[in-house]
Design a protein with these regions (language model features):
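Short helix-boundary/re-entrant hairpin motifs in multi-pass inner-membrane proteins
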Residues: 38, 44-45
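Active-site core segments that coordinate phosphate-bearing ligands/cofactors
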Residues: 1-10, 15-16, 20-31, 35-36, ...
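Gly/charged, well-structured mid-domain segments that form the phosphate/adenylate-handling core
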Residues: 46-53
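A generic structural-conservation signal
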Residues: 42-43, 156
């Protein structure tokens, strides 16, 4: 929205599916859920294909001419696509502040009762792909917690030596 200087209020299916207000089966905002929050559908972004034209930007005048914005995708979803996991059964793992294991399940959603989330991977030219994803929200950020909050390490680099000194047969709790 800001990149287009308030001209386009749009999102893609991958981001919409993460709001908890999107029906992944109907591929639209869920009327029942949004009404629970007192939200009108008109207040929500238009949902577009990931490769749709979202508008134009000149980056607040840094470019002489505005350029088109054509690629919008959630971060983990973009990582899945960027790592070439474009076919059903292909999986990627991302480790950072949080961690994500995501599997492309193809053109039909699969719902699990095992704690993984069903969402849209992307929609390219009208064709959607679904994913199953397991998240750990605070994995890489735990290093900062060990250092700054608990004072157990002086730097992130220390964790390498600690890991090397650990006995794989020992039980570790964190």
């Amino acid at each position: 929205y800001q990149l287009t200087k308030d001209h386009a209020f749009k999102t893609d299916y991958s981001n919409a599916s993460r709001t908890q207000m999107f029906n992944v089966s109907a591929l639209d905002w869920d009327e029942e859920l949004i009404s629970l929050f007192g939200i009108k559908k008109e207040m929500l972004a238009e949902i577009c294909d990931s490769n749709a034209l979202y508008g134009y930007t000149d980056f607040d005048g840094y470019l002489e001419e505005a350029i088109p914005i054509h690629g919008v995708m959630g971060d983990s979803h973009g990582a899945l696509y960027g790592q070439g996991c474009v076919n059903p059964g292909m999986i990627k793992a991302t480790y950072g502040t949080g961690s994500s294991i995501m599997m492309n399940v193809g053109e039909k959603p699969i719902f699990s009762d095992k704690g993984v989330v069903t969402s849209l991977a992307w929609s390219l030219s009208g064709k959607v792909n679904y994913v199953l994803e397991g998240n750990i929200n605070y994995t890489g950020a735990v290093i900062t917690w060990l250092q700054k909050d608990l004072g157990l390490i002086a730097s992130a680099k220390e964790t390498e030596e600690l890991a090397k000194s650990a006995n794989p047969g020992d039980t570790t709790y964190l």
